[in-house]
Protein backbone atom coordinates (compact mmCIF):
# COMPACT_ATOMS: atom_id res chain seq x y z
CA UNK A 1 0.00 0.00 0.00
CA UNK A 2 1.47 3.36 -0.94
CA UNK A 3 2.40 6.00 1.58
CA UNK A 4 1.22 8.71 -0.80
CA UNK A 5 -1.13 11.09 0.96
CA UNK A 6 -0.58 9.38 4.31
CA UNK A 7 1.69 9.96 7.29
CA UNK A 8 5.33 10.39 6.11
CA UNK A 9 7.68 7.64 7.27
CA UNK A 10 9.85 10.05 9.26
CA UNK A 11 6.76 11.16 11.19
CA UNK A 12 5.82 7.53 11.91
CA UNK A 13 9.25 6.97 13.44
CA UNK A 14 8.96 10.18 15.49
CA UNK A 15 5.49 9.18 16.73
CA UNK A 16 6.80 5.77 17.79
CA UNK A 17 9.64 7.20 19.87
CA UNK A 18 7.50 9.93 21.42
CA UNK A 19 4.82 7.43 22.42
CA UNK A 20 7.39 5.12 24.01
CA UNK A 21 9.08 7.93 25.93
CA UNK A 22 5.76 9.23 27.22
CA UNK A 23 4.83 5.77 28.51
CA UNK A 24 8.26 5.32 30.13
CA UNK A 25 7.81 8.45 32.24
CA UNK A 26 4.89 6.67 33.92
CA UNK A 27 6.19 3.11 34.27
CA UNK A 28 9.92 3.60 34.99
CA UNK A 29 9.53 2.60 38.70
CA UNK A 30 7.96 -0.71 37.63
CA UNK A 31 10.83 -1.34 35.22
CA UNK A 32 13.31 -0.80 38.05
CA UNK A 33 11.45 -3.23 40.33
CA UNK A 34 11.29 -5.80 37.53
CA UNK A 35 15.04 -5.58 36.96
CA UNK A 36 15.78 -5.86 40.69
CA UNK A 37 13.52 -8.92 40.99
CA UNK A 38 15.26 -10.62 38.07
CA UNK A 39 18.69 -9.92 39.56
CA UNK A 40 17.60 -11.13 42.99
CA UNK A 41 19.29 -14.46 43.64
CA UNK A 42 22.47 -13.78 41.70
CA UNK A 43 24.34 -13.15 44.97
CA UNK A 44 23.26 -16.49 46.41
CA UNK A 45 20.36 -15.20 48.46
CA UNK A 46 16.84 -14.07 47.70
CA UNK A 47 16.86 -10.33 48.29
CA UNK A 48 13.17 -9.58 47.78
CA UNK A 49 10.14 -11.61 48.86
CA UNK A 50 7.78 -9.93 46.41
CA UNK A 51 7.44 -6.99 44.08
CA UNK A 52 5.94 -4.86 46.84
CA UNK A 53 8.78 -5.82 49.19
CA UNK A 54 11.27 -4.80 46.50
CA UNK A 55 9.54 -1.45 45.99
CA UNK A 56 9.33 -0.62 49.70
CA UNK A 57 12.92 -1.76 50.32
CA UNK A 58 14.24 0.45 47.53
CA UNK A 59 12.38 3.52 48.81
CA UNK A 60 13.43 2.83 52.43
CA UNK A 61 17.11 2.12 51.74
CA UNK A 62 17.79 4.36 48.74
CA UNK A 63 15.18 7.10 48.94
CA UNK A 64 11.79 7.69 47.33
CA UNK A 65 13.26 9.12 44.13
CA UNK A 66 15.47 6.04 43.69
CA UNK A 67 12.54 4.40 41.89
CA UNK A 68 13.40 6.68 38.98
CA UNK A 69 17.06 5.66 38.86
CA UNK A 70 18.01 5.01 35.24
CA UNK A 71 15.26 7.24 33.82
CA UNK A 72 17.65 8.94 31.39
CA UNK A 73 18.70 5.52 30.08
CA UNK A 74 15.05 4.45 29.87
CA UNK A 75 14.19 7.50 27.79
CA UNK A 76 17.19 6.98 25.51
CA UNK A 77 16.16 3.35 25.08
CA UNK A 78 12.72 4.46 23.90
CA UNK A 79 14.23 7.14 21.65
CA UNK A 80 16.35 4.47 19.93
CA UNK A 81 14.59 1.10 20.30
CA UNK A 82 10.93 2.12 20.19
CA UNK A 83 11.42 4.78 17.53
CA UNK A 84 13.01 2.16 15.30
CA UNK A 85 10.70 -0.78 16.03
CA UNK A 86 7.35 1.04 15.81
CA UNK A 87 8.44 3.13 12.85
CA UNK A 88 9.74 0.06 11.02
CA UNK A 89 6.61 -1.97 11.82
CA UNK A 90 4.28 0.81 10.63
CA UNK A 91 6.33 1.15 7.44
CA UNK A 92 6.38 -2.62 6.77
CA UNK A 93 2.68 -2.98 7.63
CA UNK A 94 1.77 -0.32 5.10
CA UNK A 95 4.21 -1.70 2.54
CA UNK A 96 2.87 -5.26 2.61
CA UNK A 97 -0.85 -4.61 3.17
CA UNK A 98 -3.00 -4.72 0.05
CA UNK A 99 -6.06 -2.49 -0.20
CA UNK A 100 -9.09 -3.92 1.66
CA UNK A 101 -7.17 -7.13 2.45
CA UNK A 102 -5.82 -7.31 6.04
CA UNK A 103 -2.57 -9.19 6.62
CA UNK A 104 -2.70 -12.59 8.31
CA UNK A 105 -1.66 -12.91 11.97
CA UNK A 106 1.39 -14.92 10.90
CA UNK A 107 2.58 -12.20 8.53
CA UNK A 108 2.04 -9.54 11.20
CA UNK A 109 4.16 -11.64 13.57
CA UNK A 110 6.95 -11.87 10.98
CA UNK A 111 6.88 -8.10 10.45
CA UNK A 112 6.87 -7.59 14.22
CA UNK A 113 9.88 -9.88 14.66
CA UNK A 114 11.75 -8.05 11.92
CA UNK A 115 11.00 -4.62 13.37
CA UNK A 116 11.88 -5.79 16.88
CA UNK A 117 15.20 -7.29 15.85
CA UNK A 118 16.30 -4.12 14.06
CA UNK A 119 15.09 -1.85 16.87
CA UNK A 120 16.74 -3.92 19.55
CA UNK A 121 20.16 -3.84 17.90
CA UNK A 122 19.94 -0.05 17.70
CA UNK A 123 18.75 0.20 21.32
CA UNK A 124 21.11 -2.29 23.02
CA UNK A 125 23.64 0.31 24.31
CA UNK A 126 20.85 2.21 26.08
CA UNK A 127 19.50 -1.12 27.37
CA UNK A 128 22.91 -1.95 28.90
CA UNK A 129 22.99 1.43 30.64
CA UNK A 130 19.40 1.00 31.86
CA UNK A 131 20.00 -2.46 33.35
CA UNK A 132 23.14 -1.30 35.16
CA UNK A 133 21.69 1.95 36.44
CA UNK A 134 18.49 0.36 37.77
CA UNK A 135 20.43 -2.50 39.39
CA UNK A 136 23.25 -0.46 40.93
CA UNK A 137 21.51 0.25 44.23
CA UNK A 138 21.31 -3.43 45.18
CA UNK A 139 25.10 -3.82 45.15
CA UNK A 140 27.41 -3.20 48.13
CA UNK A 141 28.59 0.42 48.16
CA UNK A 142 32.13 -0.51 47.13
CA UNK A 143 30.87 -2.42 44.08
CA UNK A 144 28.49 0.21 42.72
CA UNK A 145 29.29 1.82 39.39
CA UNK A 146 27.62 5.11 40.37
CA UNK A 147 26.87 6.32 36.86
CA UNK A 148 25.62 9.91 36.98
CA UNK A 149 23.45 9.54 33.89
CA UNK A 150 23.10 7.67 30.64
CA UNK A 151 25.82 9.67 28.84
CA UNK A 152 28.23 9.03 31.73
CA UNK A 153 27.30 5.33 31.69
CA UNK A 154 27.87 4.92 27.94
CA UNK A 155 31.12 6.90 28.07
CA UNK A 156 32.55 4.96 31.02
CA UNK A 157 31.50 1.58 29.65
CA UNK A 158 33.25 2.38 26.37
CA UNK A 159 36.38 3.68 28.12
CA UNK A 160 36.65 1.04 30.87
CA UNK A 161 35.34 -2.09 29.14
CA UNK A 162 35.54 -1.42 25.42
CA UNK A 163 32.94 -0.31 22.88
CA UNK A 164 31.76 -3.86 22.16
CA UNK A 165 30.53 -4.11 25.77
CA UNK A 166 27.72 -1.78 24.70
CA UNK A 167 26.37 -4.73 22.71
CA UNK A 168 27.01 -7.38 25.39
CA UNK A 169 24.02 -9.68 25.52
CA UNK A 170 22.95 -8.48 22.08
CA UNK A 171 21.83 -11.97 21.06
CA UNK A 172 19.31 -12.48 23.92
CA UNK A 173 18.32 -8.82 23.60
CA UNK A 174 17.50 -9.23 19.91
CA UNK A 175 15.82 -12.59 20.61
CA UNK A 176 13.70 -11.02 23.34
CA UNK A 177 12.78 -8.12 21.07
CA UNK A 178 11.75 -10.48 18.29
CA UNK A 179 9.56 -12.47 20.72
CA UNK A 180 8.14 -9.30 22.28
CA UNK A 181 7.33 -7.62 19.00
CA UNK A 182 5.98 -10.74 17.32
CA UNK A 183 3.61 -11.10 20.28
CA UNK A 184 2.96 -7.44 21.05
CA UNK A 185 2.55 -5.85 17.63
CA UNK A 186 0.85 -8.78 15.92
CA UNK A 187 -1.47 -9.44 18.89
CA UNK A 188 -2.36 -5.75 19.13
CA UNK A 189 -3.14 -5.47 15.43
CA UNK A 190 -5.10 -8.74 15.45
CA UNK A 191 -7.01 -7.97 18.67
CA UNK A 192 -7.92 -4.52 17.40
CA UNK A 193 -9.08 -5.98 14.08
CA UNK A 194 -11.22 -8.60 15.88
CA UNK A 195 -12.74 -6.04 18.26
CA UNK A 196 -13.72 -3.75 15.40
CA UNK A 197 -15.06 -6.67 13.35
CA UNK A 198 -17.32 -7.67 16.26
CA UNK A 199 -19.25 -4.44 15.80
CA UNK A 200 -19.46 -3.99 19.57
CA UNK A 201 -16.51 -1.62 19.88
CA UNK A 202 -15.83 1.54 17.93
CA UNK A 203 -12.33 2.59 16.83
CA UNK A 204 -11.23 4.80 19.70
CA UNK A 205 -9.39 4.89 23.01
CA UNK A 206 -11.47 2.09 24.59
CA UNK A 207 -10.77 -0.21 21.65
CA UNK A 208 -7.06 0.64 21.80
CA UNK A 209 -7.07 0.00 25.57
CA UNK A 210 -8.64 -3.47 25.26
CA UNK A 211 -6.33 -4.49 22.41
CA UNK A 212 -3.32 -3.23 24.36
CA UNK A 213 -4.19 -5.20 27.51
CA UNK A 214 -4.59 -8.41 25.49
CA UNK A 215 -1.30 -7.68 23.76
CA UNK A 216 0.50 -6.95 27.04
CA UNK A 217 -0.54 -10.23 28.69
CA UNK A 218 0.44 -12.37 25.69
CA UNK A 219 3.77 -10.59 25.44
CA UNK A 220 4.59 -10.99 29.14
CA UNK A 221 4.06 -14.75 29.14
CA UNK A 222 6.04 -15.27 25.94
CA UNK A 223 9.01 -13.02 26.63
CA UNK A 224 9.91 -13.32 30.32
CA UNK A 225 12.35 -16.27 30.06
CA UNK A 226 14.27 -14.44 27.34
CA UNK A 227 14.14 -11.20 29.31
CA UNK A 228 15.65 -12.69 32.47
CA UNK A 229 18.54 -14.11 30.41
CA UNK A 230 19.11 -10.69 28.84
CA UNK A 231 18.96 -8.91 32.21
CA UNK A 232 21.46 -11.21 33.92
CA UNK A 233 23.95 -11.22 31.05
CA UNK A 234 23.90 -7.44 30.75
CA UNK A 235 24.26 -6.93 34.50
CA UNK A 236 27.02 -9.51 35.12
CA UNK A 237 30.60 -8.63 35.92
CA UNK A 238 33.58 -10.30 34.28
CA UNK A 239 36.08 -11.41 36.95
CA UNK A 240 39.59 -12.47 35.91
CA UNK A 241 38.42 -12.66 32.32
CA UNK A 242 35.64 -15.13 33.15
CA UNK A 243 32.02 -14.04 32.63
CA UNK A 244 29.39 -15.36 35.03
CA UNK A 245 27.28 -16.64 32.13
CA UNK A 246 28.37 -17.91 28.71
CA UNK A 247 25.09 -17.33 26.91
CA UNK A 248 21.31 -17.36 27.34
CA UNK A 249 21.19 -21.16 27.58
CA UNK A 250 23.74 -21.04 30.40
CA UNK A 251 21.55 -18.52 32.24
CA UNK A 252 18.44 -20.68 31.86
CA UNK A 253 20.30 -23.80 32.99
CA UNK A 254 21.71 -22.14 36.11
CA UNK A 255 18.42 -20.43 36.99
CA UNK A 256 16.44 -23.68 36.69
CA UNK A 257 19.07 -25.63 38.64
CA UNK A 258 19.56 -23.12 41.47
CA UNK A 259 16.21 -21.34 41.68
CA UNK A 260 13.63 -23.58 39.97
CA UNK A 261 11.95 -23.41 36.58
CA UNK A 262 9.35 -20.86 37.66
CA UNK A 263 12.18 -18.44 38.45
CA UNK A 264 12.23 -17.84 34.68
CA UNK A 265 9.05 -15.87 35.31
CA UNK A 266 10.44 -14.16 38.42
CA UNK A 267 9.14 -10.62 38.56
CA UNK A 268 6.02 -11.53 36.52
CA UNK A 269 3.84 -9.04 38.43
CA UNK A 270 6.04 -5.95 37.96
CA UNK A 271 6.86 -7.09 34.43
CA UNK A 272 3.19 -7.24 33.46
CA UNK A 273 2.34 -4.17 35.56
CA UNK A 274 5.07 -2.40 33.62
CA UNK A 275 4.50 -3.94 30.18
CA UNK A 276 0.69 -3.78 30.37
CA UNK A 277 0.43 -0.04 31.10
CA UNK A 278 3.45 0.70 28.90
CA UNK A 279 1.81 -1.14 26.01
CA UNK A 280 -1.52 0.61 26.65
CA UNK A 281 0.02 4.07 26.94
CA UNK A 282 2.35 3.59 23.97
CA UNK A 283 -0.40 2.46 21.61
CA UNK A 284 -2.96 5.01 22.83
CA UNK A 285 -0.47 7.89 22.52
CA UNK A 286 0.60 6.60 19.10
CA UNK A 287 -2.98 6.25 17.85
CA UNK A 288 -3.95 9.71 19.17
CA UNK A 289 -0.95 11.40 17.53
CA UNK A 290 -1.76 9.58 14.31
CA UNK A 291 -5.42 10.68 14.49
CA UNK A 292 -4.40 14.29 15.21
CA UNK A 293 -2.06 14.27 12.20
CA UNK A 294 -4.84 13.08 9.91
CA UNK A 295 -7.33 15.56 11.35
CA UNK A 296 -5.21 18.72 11.53
CA UNK A 297 -2.47 18.21 8.94
CA UNK A 298 -3.95 15.95 6.25
CA UNK A 299 -7.52 17.07 7.00
CA UNK A 300 -9.12 13.76 6.05
CA UNK A 301 -10.46 10.55 7.58
CA UNK A 302 -8.15 8.70 9.92
CA UNK A 303 -6.27 5.56 8.87
CA UNK A 304 -5.09 3.33 11.73
CA UNK A 305 -1.47 3.74 12.88
CA UNK A 306 -1.03 -0.04 13.28
UniProtKB/Swiss-Prot annotation:
UniProt xrefs under PROSITE patterns: SOLCAR (PS50920)
GO CC terms of this entry: mitochondrial inner membrane; mitochondrion
Outcome of gene disruption: Viable, with no visible phenotype. Animals have increased levels of reactive oxygen species along with increased sensitivity to the reactive oxygen species (ROS) generator Jugalone (5-hydroxy-1,4-naphtoquinone). Conversely, display increased resistance to sodium azide, which is a mitochondrial poison that inhibits cytochrome c. Animals also have morphological defects in their mitochondondria, whereby mitochondria are smaller in size, abnormally shaped, and contain fewer cristae which are irregular and disorganized.
Gene Ontology MF terms: antiporter activity; transmembrane transporter activity
Membrane topology classification: Multi-pass membrane protein
InterPro entries attached to this UniProt entry: Mito_Metabolite_Transporter, Mitochondrial_sb/sol_carrier, Mt_carrier_dom_sf
A Pfam family annotated for this UniProt entry: Mito_carr
SUPFAM superfamilies: Mitochondrial carrier (SSF103506)
Reactions that this protein is recorded to catalyse: (S)-malate(in) + 2-oxoglutarate(out) = (S)-malate(out) + 2-oxoglutarate(in); malonate(in) + 2-oxoglutarate(out) = malonate(out) + 2-oxoglutarate(in); succinate(in) + 2-oxoglutarate(out) = succinate(out) + 2-oxoglutarate(in); maleate(in) + 2-oxoglutarate(out) = maleate(out) + 2-oxoglutarate(in)
Gene3D superfamilies in the record: Mitochondrial carrier domain (1.50.40.10)
UniProt Solcar repeat ranges: 7-95, 103-194, 203-292
Biological process, per Gene Ontology: lipid transport
Transmembrane segments: 9-38, 72-93, 108-122, 172-192, 205-226, 268-286
Intracellular or extracellular location(s): Mitochondrion; Mitochondrion inner membrane
Tissue specificity field: Ubiquitously expressed, but highly expressed in the anterior pharynx.
Family: Belongs to the mitochondrial carrier (TC 2.A.29) family.
Binding partners and assembly: Interacts with ant-1.1 and ced-9.
Reported function: Catalyzes the transport of 2-oxoglutarate (alpha-oxoglutarate) across the inner mitochondrial membrane in an electroneutral exchange for malate. Can also exchange 2-oxoglutarate for other dicarboxylic acids such as malonate, succinate, maleate and oxaloacetate, although with lower affinity. Contributes to several metabolic processes, including the malate-aspartate shuttle, the oxoglutarate/isocitrate shuttle, in gluconeogenesis from lactate, and in nitrogen metabolism. Maintains mitochondrial fusion and fission events, and the organization and morphology of cristae.
Name this protein carries in UniProt: Mitochondrial 2-oxoglutarate/malate carrier protein
Organism of provenance: Caenorhabditis elegans
Upper classification of the organism: Eukaryota, Metazoa, Ecdysozoa, Nematoda, Chromadorea
Amino acid sequence: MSNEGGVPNVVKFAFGGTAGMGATLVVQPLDLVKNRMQLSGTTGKKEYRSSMHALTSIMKNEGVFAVYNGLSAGLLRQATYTTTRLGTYAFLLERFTEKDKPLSFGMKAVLGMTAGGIGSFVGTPAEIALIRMTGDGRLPVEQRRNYTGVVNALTRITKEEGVLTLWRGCTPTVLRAMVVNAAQLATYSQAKQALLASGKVQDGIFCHFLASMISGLATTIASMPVDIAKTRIQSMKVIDGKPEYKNAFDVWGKVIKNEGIFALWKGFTPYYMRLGPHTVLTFIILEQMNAAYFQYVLKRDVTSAL
